[in-house]
Amino acid sequence: MRKMRKFLNILFLCTLALGLSSCEPDDGEDYYIYDTLPGGIWVGDLGFADAYNSPLESGLYFEGNGVGKDEQAYYNDPYGEVAFRLPFRWDIHGRILRLDYGYNYPLLEIYDVYVAGDRLSGVLYVDGHMDGPVMQERQY
């Protein structure tokens, strides 16, 4: 009887430990994405355009200290020369990647951000309004 009670107590404690650990938020994925972004340039469309409404492709350089730069080029430029350079601050929390370009630009957030190999995908929000799906590809 004592052995059975001891066994049930151990089983109860194991179940309790598993149950409590599953209630904690999983920041492991945030750390993985945070560590994956620096290195290379992430190229794709983030909705930027010039004064004449010509679309620009963004090339994002992420640094490990939460800052980065966006080198933008015209889609139809065969040489891919940089037309604009914009600094930004970035962070990730709860699978939301925030790109803050400062007061003169809207806050960009990529929800449900997912990195698989050299592709980053998610849903782009501009100042809190959904813009649509986005995908960036890493180039070296």
Q: Where are these predicted regions, by residue range?
A:
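N-terminal helix-cap/turn-to-beta initiation motif at the start of protein domains
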Residues: 27-43, 140
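Short secondary-structure boundary/capping segments
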Residues: 31-34, 89, 112
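Bacterial N-terminal signal peptides that target proteins for export
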Residues: 2-10
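Beta-sheet ligand-binding and adhesion/scaffold domains
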Residues: 48, 57-61, 67, 96-140
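N-terminal glycine/threonine-rich, aromatic-flanked beta-hairpin/loop signature
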Residues: 52-98
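Hydrophobic helical h-region of N-terminal Sec-dependent signal peptides
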Residues: 9-17
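Structural detector for hydrophobic anchor residues on beta-strands
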Residues: 38, 42, 66-68, 120
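C-terminal motif of bacterial Sec signal peptides marking the signal peptidase cleavage site
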Residues: 18-22
